[in-house]
Amino acid sequence: MPERADGSPRWIVRRALKVAVAGALRAAGAHRAVGTLRRRQAGGARVLVVSYHRVTHDYRASAREGLASLLVSAGTLRRQLEQLGRTRDLVSLADARRILAEPPGTARARDVVTVTFDDGYADVHGVALPILRALGAPATAFVVTGLVGTARRLPHDRIYAALAELTARGIPPERAGLPRGAQALLDACARAGPAATLDRLIARLPQPRLLEVADALAARVGLSDPDLPAGTRLLDWDEVRALQAGGVEVGGHTVTHAVLPHLPAGRARREIAGCRDALAERLGRPPRAFAYPNGYHTPAVRRLVADLGFQVAVTTEDAENVRGGDPLALRRKMVWENTTLGPAGYSPALATCNLEGVFTALGLVRPVPGEWRALAAAEEERARPPGRSPGPRRSRAAAG
């Protein structure tokens, strides 16, 4: 589960220690040493792709009613991009792809960073766009075309809201009282806390089964999609067009936010092609960029994305991008409020160590792995004999 900024003594102590370590590392020049090493390993230039989801004016209020690890406040977003821009050039995803296609060893005066937003939340237009314009920051927003302009919400927001409501009522998931099939699916994925349970449901269940659980949970607690927090609203087509007009590239994120490796090849193709065609029709040109829902991808899925005309695709693997790598498997760092949050507010030292990969390089943070590995681990766990305890697993909700 993500570490919420709850202001508790325990949280303050943990954050203060983390900021102190970050300050010492920055003072010692660890970020410069890591940067030099990683730049050499990457082929002469570091290309950082950062991933955001929702942008809110009030992080604490939004975190009380939704997935905290998908949130960043407007002020923090601005400071993160300003800090990144002091040492890197802010470039488009297309430029990042071009730089990575250069021969290894090609020198650049500065490293680069490109900004992405997943899922197509409405606040990317309402809150993030003015910040991007003010900073002159190119960005790409990946949208779920089947939900654009509707009152429907994303499956993960629906499930999280219902699980959180059950928790508030003191009802554990295994006693939710869902219809038999849905309850069995929930029982198999239940973990401590709504976010961890949600992670397991997404990792294990194909889209029809995931929606079955979402519908059953919503009915159980009496939550319809419009009842969910206002911040979970998705873009409408006018807002999507306004993003494009404002200099934000619009990329594909499937029709329904289906986890593609769970689907038969034909349906996966329809999810990708349907998204591409809707964007081409609504925006006047086909999208060039694609984001795998939840970062889950396989070689077969990547081939589909390439066959359908996409030039670049992004994952959620937190690792360095290297020259000569697959442009359909670019790595990204998931960034949210806690990435740079100290007990007294924004921490430049913590931002440096997290955004520049210092903690990861020193083994102080476990990075989000490539999702094809995560899927393999899920399959292995699924086959584990009953009663055998699984090893520790880092929640996807805590990524970044």
Could you tell me what each predicted segment is?
Residues T116-R158:
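Long, hydrophobic, well-ordered secondary-structure blocks that form the structural core
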Residues P2-T116, D123, L154-A168, P173-R175, ...:
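C-terminal active-site subregion of NodB/CE4 polysaccharide deacetylases
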Residues H53-T56, T145-L147, T254:
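Short, flexible active-site-adjacent loop segments at beta-strand->alpha-helix junctions, enriched
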Residues R108-A109, Y121, L129-F142, A184, ...:
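CE4/NodB-like, metal-dependent polysaccharide N-deacetylase domain
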Residues G85, I131-L135, L235-G252:
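Acidic (Asp/Glu)-rich catalytic clusters
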